[in-house]
Curated annotation (Swiss-Prot):
GO terms for cellular component: extracellular region; host cell cytoplasm; host cell nucleus. Secreted effector that completely suppresses the host cell death induced by cell death-inducing proteins. A motif (RxLR-dEER) lies at residues 33-45. This is Secreted RxLR effector protein 135. Residues 1-20 form the signal peptide. Belongs to the RxLR effector family.
Length: 163
């Protein structure tokens, strides 16, 4: 606001040299009134919206960084990315080579197949990868009952049975 006020003052002095003191003072008063009205409208708008500016708002813009500090900051940022650290690394670089997770496509070929519960029903269902019947049955049966359908144990039992 001060800078704007100084600018208007300088403008007024410039006008005094070119137009005369009376015209310049009238122009200056007109400009000042217009600026005050605009500032008042802005303040009212901000108050109505409930937005409050922080106290350090003006200070942040006054601080100017030298070229050395800017160069240092950019170098530090590039080092962070090289070392795979920093807040943005994971977001952009960590998952760069990995394919995105794809949702399984649900085929619209009719109702879903019912789950097989008994070994007899399991035997009736064809295997997806050409597995043996015993293996497919063992996959469907609970853990306690799996030993009875274990192919290795079945072959041992078959050897024990006299022909």
């Amino acid at each position: 606001m001060r800078r704007l006020y100084l600018f208007v003052l300088i403008l007024a002095t410039f006008l005094t040299t070119s137009h005369g003191i009376v015209d310049a003072s009238q122009d200056f008063q007109h400009l000042r009134r217009g600026l005050q009205e605009e500032a008042g409208e802005d303040e009212e708008r901000i108050k109505l919206s409930g937005f409050k500016l922080p106290k350090s708002f003006g200070k942040r813009f006054k601080q100017k960084l030298s070229t050395k500090t800017k160069a240092f900051a950019t170098r530090a940022a590039s080092r962070m990315f090289q070392k795979k650290k920093g807040p943005l690394y994971g977001k952009y670089y960590k998952n760069a080579g990995k394919p995105k997770r794809q949702t399984p496509q649900i085929a619209a070929t009719g109702p879903a197949k019912p789950k097989v519960q008994s070994p007899e029903e399991a035997a009736a269902v064809p295997g997806p990868y050409g597995q043996s019947l015993e293996y497919r049955v063992a996959q469907k049966v609970p853990l306690r009952e799996r030993e009875a359908f274990n192919p290795a144990k079945l072959s041992k039992i078959n050897e024990m049975i006299p022909v």
